[in-house]
Amino acid sequence: MAAKIRKGDKVIVLTGRDKGRTGEVFEVRPDAGTALVRGINLVKRHQKQTQNQEGGIITKEAPINLSNVAYVGKDGKPTRIGFKIQADGKKVRVAKSSGVEIDG
């Protein structure tokens, strides 16, 4: 499947505990169909102490399914993403709601 959501994209959460919140994608896991979004889906993990790292309870982002996030367009509203092939043969992402090219 083509990468409709990519690293650096601003997304909004559609369902779940963080519904309506926005954040920036800092990692995409295409094989699992998930992404990590900064400040979204925070969970507490027990960290074992090592020589380099202090032990204790840390808060970090957990993966969120790509079907539960939507790209936020320039107008600040969530939009679906499609693809368009330009005249020079380059494939670019396009916002379905406005038709604006996202990259390229």
Curated annotation (Swiss-Prot):
PROSITE patterns: RIBOSOMAL_L24. Keywords: Ribonucleoprotein, Ribosomal protein, RNA-binding, rRNA-binding. It comes from the Bacteria. GO terms for molecular function: rRNA binding; structural constituent of ribosome. GO terms for cellular component: ribonucleoprotein complex; ribosome. GO terms for biological process: translation. One of two assembly initiator proteins, it binds directly to the 5'-end of the 23S rRNA, where it nucleates assembly of the 50S subunit. One of the proteins that surrounds the polypeptide exit tunnel on the outside of the subunit. Part of the 50S ribosomal subunit. Belongs to the universal ribosomal protein uL24 family. HAMAP family: Ribosomal_uL24_B. This is Large ribosomal subunit protein uL24. The lineage of its organism: Bacteria, Pseudomonadati, Pseudomonadota, Alphaproteobacteria, Hyphomicrobiales.
